[in-house]
Swiss-Prot record:
GO biological process: gluconeogenesis
Cell compartments where the protein resides: Cytoplasm
Protein's recorded name: Phosphoenolpyruvate carboxykinase (ATP)
Stated role: Involved in the gluconeogenesis. Catalyzes the conversion of oxaloacetate (OAA) to phosphoenolpyruvate (PEP) through direct phosphoryl transfer between the nucleoside triphosphate and OAA.
GO molecular-function terms, A-Z: ATP binding; metal ion binding; phosphoenolpyruvate carboxykinase (ATP) activity
Species annotation: Shewanella baltica (strain OS195)
Catalysis performed (reactions): oxaloacetate + ATP = phosphoenolpyruvate + ADP + CO2
UniProt pathway: Carbohydrate biosynthesis; gluconeogenesis
Enzyme Commission identifier(s): 4.1.1.49
Superkingdom, taxonomy of origin: Bacteria
UniProt keywords, alphabetically: ATP-binding, Cytoplasm, Decarboxylase, Gluconeogenesis, Lyase, Manganese, Metal-binding, Nucleotide-binding
């Protein structure tokens, strides 16, 4: 950047950034003190506009395709220079932050933003270290220029906006995008590429720890309950979305939370509710005339969000780290109403369901998605963020589970008694009771019933849960129709899994079509 031509605010405080955002017309204050900002037409991630620079140091390690689209190194150089020139006379906000709450596995990153509220988001979601880059690692750079308009013909992009990762130069370019989630997910993708080479499993999961130091992980796509279920008043939060699992422990990749706000209530989600206050960024949340947020209003998007630092949560693990997990929960949102609320998995079944990543897009975080809920298979419960081939992550998961002896569970936070539109969704208290049973160890060696088509072991009793709910066939009025839907789901699993080169033990661990 050309210093002297523009005003640069370096490592600004929360109060300064809120003040700048209000003065510059970037947002408004709510009655609870949070800052509301609107992102315009792009109210979610833009996967079609995300690229990775194809260069010799990383190209052999990346699974190229529609998720990881290749970008020309020369075109990147030109576009980066044009964005720098565009920002040269603009007021800018810059912070030196870190990604990864681990002394060995952190990445230092300098974040430069055109908007004050984007900088506040970055400082909420990334880690503000006591001492920046104590191991003197090469520093990553993020530039976020939301008002820069890309020209596909000139810039080599797919539209007027883009996200580009460059592993060789340690650069992330965001241009033409106001949705702040792109910043956090771009650095998550960076860590998802770097960590496996160090023997660390990067995970799209939340994590918490009990009073006795027992760690639980919750894997799942957006909207399946990662943030809600890990924000447990009886446990201490490590983080809500991105973690690394190294030999000896897990660590948060972030320093904050990015919670979905749609239908947020104080009763069901008190931890998140209380975290929304001064310093929090609310994205696309609608307010009433008294500036009170209306979390039921989805007129701008289903994907309304709250971004706040972990310090806003009273019951948190202050070092953002935990021991290796005794329990690992795969959260799936089953729109067919076929899966049980909880199943106990073998390690082969864990690998099968981790690779499958069966769930639904709920209030999708991607632009272009309607509010319609549809089933999907998202490898590793986060396909859009993993640059390496899926097998790399599955092998690391198997290794970690085996070496520590973690027990894996499949928990359905979706529908029962019929598909979406006919059946009803499991309520949060029911799922919380199941999670309580998991973390207490109650389900470790219990009596189970085997569901043949789904090839799943289901406990016959769970404290605090109606036993009729545990075997899904009991909740369907038409048992023959249930069998038909179960068969359809088993076929969908088998068809999706055909692409994976795995052992017979893993392949045979799935549903039986």
């Amino acid at each position: 950047m050309a210093d002297g031509l523009n005003r640069v605010h370096f490592n600004p405080s929360t109060a300064q950034l809120v003040e700048f955002a209000l003065l510059r017309g970037e947002g408004e204050l709510t009655a609870n003190g949070a800052l509301v900002a609107k992102t315009g037409a792009r109210s979610g991630r833009s996967p079609g506009d995300r690229f990775i620079v194809r260069e010799p140091s990383s190209e052999a390690e990346i699974e190229w395709g529609p998720v990881n689209q290749a970008f020309d190194p020369g075109a990147f150089e030109g576009l980066w220079a044009r964005v720098e020139a565009y920002l040269a006379d603009k007021e800018l906000f810059v912070s030196d932050l870190e990604v990864g709450a681990d002394t060995e596995h952190y990445q230092p990153v300098r974040v430069t933003t055109q908007y004050a509220w984007h900088q506040l988001f970055a400082r909420n979601l990334f880690i503000i270290p006591e001492e920046f880059n104590r191991k003197d690692k090469p520093v990553w750079q993020i530039i976020n220029a939301p008002d820069f308009v890309c020209d596909p013909e000139r810039d080599g992009t797919n539209s007027d906006a883009t996200v580009i990762l460059n592993f060789a130069e340690r650069k992330v370019l965001l241009a033409g995008l106001k949705y702040a989630g792109e910043m956090k997910k771009s650095m998550f993708s960076v860590q998802n590429f770097l960590l496996p080479a160090q023997g660390v499993l990067p995970m799209h999961c939340s994590a918490n720890v009990g009073k006795d130091g027992d760690t639980t992980l919750f894997f799942g796509l957006s909207g399946t309950g990662k943030t809600t279920l890990s924000a447990d008043p009886k446990r201490f939060l490590i983080g809500d979305d991105e973690h690394g699992w190294a030999p000896g422990g897990v660590f948060n990749i972030e320093g904050g939370c990015y919670a979905k706000c749609i239908d947020l209530s104080q009763k069901n989600e008190p931890v998140i509710w209380d975290a929304i206050r001064f310093g929090t960024v609310l994205e696309n949340v609608v307010m009433d005339e008294h500036r009170v947020p209306n979390y039921k209003d989805s007129s701008l998007t289903e994907n309304t969000r709250a971004a706040y630092p972990l310090e806003h949560i009273a019951q948190r693990k202050e070092d953002n780290c935990g021991a290796e997990p005794h329990a690992v929960v795969f959260l799936t949102c089953d729109v067919s109403g076929v899966l049980p609320p909880v199943s106990i998995l073998t390690k082969e079944q864990a690998a099968y369901h981790f690779l499958s990543g069966y769930t639904a897009k709920v209030g999708s975080t991607e632009i272009g998605s309607t509010s319609a809920i549809q089933s999907t298979f998202s490898t590793c419960f986060g396909a859009p963020f993993f640059p390496r081939p899926a097998g790399v992550y599955a092998e690391l998961l198997m290794k970690r589970i085996e070496s520590f002896g973690s027990q894996v569970y499949l928990v359905n936070t979706g529908w029962t008694g019929g598909p979406h539109g006919v059946g009803k969704r499991f309520d949060i208290p029911t799922t919380r009771a199941i999670v309580d049973a998991i973390v207490s160890g109650e389900l470790k060696d219990v009596e189970t019933v085997h569901l043949d088509t789904l090839n799943l072991a289901v406990p016959v009793a769970v404290s605090g849960v109606d036993s009729n709910l545990l075997n899904p066939i009991n909740t369907w009025g038409d048992k023959a129709l249930y069998a038909e839907y179960a068969q359809k789901l088993a076929e969908a699993f088998t068809k999706n899994f055909a692409k994976y080169q795995v052992s017979d033990a893993i392949r045979n661990a799935g549903p039986k079509a």
